[in-house]
Amino acid sequence: DAKGNEDFAAADSTSTFNAVSLSSGAVYQLDPIWSLAANLGYTERAPTFYELYANGAHVATGAYEVGDASLNKEKAIAADLALRFDNGTHKGSVGVFYSHFRNYIGLISSGNLREGHHHDGDDDHDHDHGDIPEYLYQGVRARFYGIEAQDRWQLLENRYGSFALELSGDYTRANNLDTGEPLPRIAPLRLNSGLLWSLERWQARVDVQHAASQQRKPSNETSTDGYTTLGASVGYRFDVGQSQWLAFVRGENLTNQTVRYASSILRDIAPAPGRSVEVGLRTSF
């Protein structure tokens, strides 16, 4: 509605954006096992309608979001460099990445509270849901950089099955160059490991995921504690006619840890689910 409503501001003008993206990449083979991979790119992204015109309480995020109709395109130059190896039974990579934004569009806390309302269809009876934090869609200069690594090692294969180990990790630093503070909701150091087993139609895996605490945040945001979770699954594949099926049991966060994702705007009011067990049947045609 161009006239606006309780969730979106009035729009008395038309916004038109032409976004372009360019990228190039290369791989240099050092020897039969080792190689270098590099990528360079330039991207533009047009702001979405809610980044431009939001002006109300967002039920899903528990925030009062305010857009900016004057936002320009998001523009970024990005580069990454990775060292890869693959000897058949053992393969992985370690790499670094860097991105510079001229106009990073982020949802940034103003530090203020706004009154949230819900309408139940009766204009004479608004139900006050109390004060909720205000977040502004803003375009800022920003810098992202970090490191990431992954590894898969085929441990052994015998009559008892095939065993493999998967390892991965990543770390990102992101700064608001306009304020000098860290950007909000950036994931901390994350480390993952998984032990995989398969034998004929059977498969199973055990995963351990660790996230460090996140203390790098704007002054008006909260930090998050680190956590380590355990997951496990077992599955059996079978065929029905021309269809392939998988019956599985999967457990997540089996140690029932309190997990608050640093990247979630709801982290202070809604932690991630605790212990869960799922039984399922999946097919592909």
Which stretches of residues belong to each language-model region?
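Transmembrane beta-barrel strands of outer-membrane/channel proteins
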Residues: 1, 26, 38-42, 51, ...
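Surface-exposed extracellular loop regions of Gram-negative outer-membrane beta-barrel proteins
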Residues: 1-11, 17-23, 157-166
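Residues on the lipid-exposed face of transmembrane beta-strands in outer-membrane beta-barrel proteins
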Residues: 24-28, 79-85, 96, 147-153, ...
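C-terminal beta-signal and adjacent terminal beta-strands/loops
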Residues: 44-45, 102, 213-216, 236-285
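Gram-negative outer-membrane beta-barrel transporters
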Residues: 97-101, 105, 110-112, 118-216, ...
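Outer-membrane beta-barrel signature, preferentially recognizing the C-terminal barrel domain
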Residues: 10-25, 29, 33, 42-93, ...
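Outer-membrane beta-barrel translocator domains and adjoining extracellular loop/strand segments
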Residues: 2-10, 50-55, 62-64, 104-112, ...
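Repeated loop/turn-to-beta-strand initiation elements of outer-membrane beta-barrel proteins
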Residues: 33-36, 89-92, 158-163, 201-205, ...
